[in-house]
């Protein structure tokens, strides 16, 4: 399995989630299989998004796309996102 992990903060979670949901089809067309959004339990707007992708090449291509950059700007992402690409090594 191929994974992409994105860490960033947002100005307003609900506004961010609305934009995130609006680009669902774009993510799917580029190979996204599923996602999980995680928030810190202290109520902050620091998010971690874990995506399962069909392959790492598609994940990297999507992460570098102008469409993603534009969506992040519209969604109110603050600061520079941290993006990691991972392959599953073991599962329990």
Model-predicted segments: where are they?
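Short S/T/G/P-rich N-terminal loop/turn motif that feeds into the first structured element of a domain
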Residues: 1-66, 70, 74-92
């Amino acid at each position: 399995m191929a994974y992409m992990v994105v860490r960033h903060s947002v100005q307003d979670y609900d506004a961010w989630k609305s934009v995130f949901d609006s680009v669902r089809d774009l993510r799917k067309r580029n190979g996204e299989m599923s996602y999980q959004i995680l928030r810190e339990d202290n109520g902050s707007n620091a998010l971690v998004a874990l995506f399962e992708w069909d392959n790492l090449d598609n994940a990297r291509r999507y992460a570098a796309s102008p469409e993603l950059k534009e969506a992040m700007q519209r969604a109110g992402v603050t600061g520079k996102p941290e993006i990691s690409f991972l392959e599953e090594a073991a599962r329990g």
